[in-house]
Amino acid sequence: MLNVNFVNEASSTNQGLVVFIDEQLKLDSNLIGLDQQHHGLISKTIQNKLQFTGKYGQIKVIPSVIKSGEVRYLIIAGLGNEEKLTEAKIEELGGKILQHATSCKISTIGLKITNRISRFTSQTFASLVASGAFLASYRFDKYRTTLKEAEKFAVESIEIFTDNSTETAKLFEIKKLIAEAVFFTRDISNEPSNIKTPQVYAERIVDRLEPLGVDVDVIGEREMKNLGMGALLGVGQGSQNESKLVVMEYKGGSKDVPTIALVGKGVIFDTGGISLKPSSDMHLMRYDMGGSAAVVGTIIAVAGQKLPVNIVGVVGLVENMLSGNAQRPGDVVTTMSGQTAEVLNTDAEGRLVLADAVWYAQEKFKPKCVIDVATLTGAITIALGNTYAGCFSNNDELADKLIKVGEEVNEKLWRMPLHDEYDAMIHSDIADMANIANVPRAAGSCIAAHFIKRFIKDGVDWAHLDIAGVANSNKASALGPKGAVGYGVRLLEKFIKEYT
């Protein structure tokens, strides 16, 4: 794991030294002295606009001309227009710096924070850069046994020189704790489905959360049957691995602090069931539990900080598999709420899992607010691509708060519509509702949201986040490699911290 330290005075023991330059291409007094130490290398570089323009995100790695000392490289990072810098952009810049250092095999980095950006203190700026670098250091290579030495290379440490290093370190410790929660979410999402069975996944949740003072209850199929969870159990009935409902309760607030319930879809692997998925990308269905992973990661972050809030997490862990016992198209299931659902398509299974999970959360904990998170529909990816998750809500204020926080942490949400006409499209002739629309290929994400909405009680504020397009990525970003993104943890953690 990347080691991050904050110091008040610069050290000469790092192989790479990072400085920040904005698009004005001017050196402040501190950088002038550093430039002189390096025989004008910084000023010569920024004078040549073919080499460096100072635009945001530009990174220039230059071999040092100093013959003595440990510094082998100067790394010049572009800030662009300082007025347009956001916390998210600063974090991403930290990630880019780490990635460039890794590609250049620079094992130790020093960062010199000399810039005075009006909207950010040097402590905030430094902690954000460190947070981005730490997030970008994540790897999932535990099953790669033949990695070459060059592929194993990782930056060992970052040392950040800034005023008031003690205060900066405190800011970073919170960000590091949140990043480690993101890492749990990425880890469990990246894990192959033959390893992370519902039982194993539940055990990992217990092992991670109980030391943080979170009460965890793992409910098996017998108890779920007694509770009447026919929708969730129907999804998992084709698997030889028993389905689980994991209930997490963090009681950090007083009794008069309203409870927020986070509910996650945890389909460990989704074949589509008898309504079989195409084989080409079916291996990616190991990520179909990304919503549940975001819920668990959020509770790790909240409990780790001992926030004065009351949070409940409920995740339904199932496998949607083919067998002689698998659920059939046309089956009717009775949900915990007593409502019945006709299963017209076994690949629309996530909403069935959530139906029982959100009802259980409301029945047992009486929350003021329910937020469910799910890799629910391919339709949301068609609508929004891989930039935004879809946000459906019965409460404008709740939706606005989530969207605002999403912009701040760069986990973007786009408000999607709910309408009575969509609700009418899940009519069934033989049950209370159908799990897909009676109009083929129409408004798929909206239809799924309305199915879940049928299980939200009157007076409960509700938001449904469809993260199917953003939970995993087929390319690296500034904050991590391709694979599981860990989307939702930072969004929900900040929402809970700021608005409860």
From Swiss-Prot:
GO biological process, one term: proteolysis
Leader sequence segment: none
A GO CC term assigned to this protein in UniProt: cytoplasm
UniProt remark on cofactor binding: Binds 2 manganese ions per subunit.
Entry cofactors: Mn(2+)
Residues the entry annotates as binding Mn(2+) 1: 270, 347, 349
Enzyme class per UniProt: hydrolase
Entry keyword set: Aminopeptidase, Cytoplasm, Hydrolase, Manganese, Metal-binding, Protease
InterPro entries (UniProt xref): Leucine_aapep/pepB, Macro_dom-like, Peptidase_M17_C, Peptidase_M17_leu_NH2_pept, Peptidase_M17_N
Catalytic activity, EC: 3.4.11.1, 3.4.11.10
CDD domains, per the entry: Peptidase_M17
Reactions catalysed: Release of an N-terminal amino acid, Xaa-|-Yaa-, in which Xaa is preferably Leu, but may be other amino acids including Pro although not Arg or Lys, and Yaa may be Pro. Amino acid amides and methyl esters are also readily hydrolyzed, but rates on arylamides are exceedingly low; Release of an N-terminal amino acid, preferentially leucine, but not glutamic or aspartic acids
Single Gene Ontology MF annotation: manganese ion binding
Compartments, record wording: Cytoplasm
Active-site positions on this chain: 277, 351
Protein family membership: Belongs to the peptidase M17 family.
Function as written in the Swiss-Prot or TrEMBL entry: Presumably involved in the processing and regular turnover of intracellular proteins. Catalyzes the removal of unsubstituted N-terminal amino acids from various peptides.
NCBIfam families: PRK00913.1-2, PRK00913.1-4, PRK00913.2-2, PRK00913.2-4
HAMAP family, per database record: Cytosol_peptidase_M17
Protein name in UniProt: Probable cytosol aminopeptidase
Annotated gene: pepA
